[in-house]
Amino acid sequence: RDIQPQTVGKFCFLYRLTYMQNSQQNNKRIAKNTILLYVRMILVMGVTLYTSRIILRALGVSDYGIYNVVGGVVSMFGFINTSLGRASSRFITYALGKGDKEELQKIFNCVVTIHYLIALIVLVLAETIGLWFVTEKLVIPEGRETAAFWVYQSSVLAAFIMLASTPFNGLIIAHERMGAFAYISIFETLSKLLICFLLFIIPFDRLIVYSVLIVLTQTVVRLLYTFYCNKHFEESHYKLVWDKEKSKKIFAYAGWTMNGELAIVGYTQGLNILLNLFFGPVVNASRGIAVQVQGAVMQFFKNFQVAVRPQIIKSYAQGDFSYMHKLVLSCSRYSFYLMLIVSLPVLFQTEYILKLWLGTVPNHCVAFIQIMMFVGMNYTFNTPTTMALHATGNIKRFQIIEGTMLLSVVPVAYILLKYFHISPESVFITYFFIEIVTQIVRVIIIYPMVKMPISYYFTKVMWPIVKVCSLVWIPPLLVNISIPHQGFIKLIVMCIVCVLSTMVCVYVLGMNVSEREFMVKKVKAFKGKFWMK
């Protein structure tokens, strides 16, 4: 009552100024981390593609197949690590956003204890049921049983180390130290490249040597993550504790996340089996190639989303819903733009890219890839929306509904295949439409939970995207008509035109006024620095 209006005005001004400064710092951190993750992605992807050829040549087709099938038995436990990793990351990031160091220490200790416990359970299962399956059920070429055994044991040890050390990865991402994450990943990739060349020198069984060296590399990498955390983060010094209440929350969260991961495995493998039953293994091979291409293209927006995720959770923990809403909406739009800029050349030049990569293009592969590009574009909206949900920690109802909807594609596809004799391409189109409906349901459920109007999704995300998509395809189409013959020159021209077309359309139609002003300001600042040099 005694506070003067001038004082209130000054307080409001200082609050707005502080808020703007914090937002600018957070945006700069997101941009920096995104760039670091993209540099990591380009290097890792390039080296991985090269090492795949070297490994195949060094091991031979048979041993390479043994390594993949035996290691694949252990990789079935991968969804456990994914679910626990998401739970760890969410609770650590949330505690960090609250600014409670004591709570953060308790959460980290609890998370590490849970990971150690699950790692031991996986180890027991792998050395009993898993080992029995490998030795009794898998078809291993005669004389390679010992090598297969060592490959399996190395894979089990690698899985154990991965599970035990995942909380340290979550800590690095929660603190948004993407530089460390990128540099250690690059070290791991280059180490694997070195191993490939060592295989041609070491005079022992190459398959055994390769599996042992890979697990040694992963051990060193995990130790690097641990040492980095111990040096930079106080809360990373682990103490054995068991907090029943916190453990219950983390287990419940991880359990419902695991339900979602199992649903993904279910509909993915379910569709694969249906395609095999109705059309044979050739269609499975085409689908495998399409999924591989989609996965590579989707990395271009997933790195951006990894950089944004900690800020979404922290802003929710701090009660800053305005900034959180802005992040979710902006992340959805710009993830789509990143996917679009890479998808356009693939959509127009699918057949030539496949010929360049594989030599021979399998049947249905072109159509599969083109449909999966559209699935990937729709998927760009998924992660920012579910990031907001995971920030709340209230995921049970959503995971049940989402998992049921995604799994419904299997019985729907079966009915259409059995009674309406649809084509393999129609199976993918069915999957695409179910993904669209599921995304709409995600928005309807999640937006009210984080106090965001559902209309924002359509006015601030979908409408700018519709405007961009209405024009962005015209210049590439004109190039496609003007240069009728396929070739490398046409591919390069198409890539350049697609990038320029997307950039212009996004700037004119896909950005709001403040975003355009920010972009112009950054370009001018960059030009100023460049000309000064």
Label every PLM stretch briefly.
Residues T82-K98, A174, F233-E234, A290, ...:
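Helix-loop junctions and terminal segments of transmembrane helices
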Residues V8-Q21, Y447-F458, I474-K533:
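Membrane-proximal transmembrane or re-entrant/amphipathic helices at the cytosolic face
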Residues V112-V139, L198, L223, H325-T380, ...:
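Alpha-helical transmembrane segments of multi-pass membrane transport and lipid-handling proteins
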Residues I55-M76, I107, L207-V212, K246-Y253, ...:
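Interfacial/gating helices of multi-pass transporter permease domains
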Residues L56-A58, S62-D63, G179, L190-L223, ...:
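Membrane-interface helix-loop junctions in multi-pass transport and translocation proteins
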Residues K32-L49, E188, L213-N230, K244-K314, ...:
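Transmembrane helical elements of multi-pass membrane transporters/channels
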Residues Q4, Y15-I30, I208-S211, Y225-Q269, ...:
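Interhelical loop/hinge segments that connect adjacent transmembrane helices in multipass membrane
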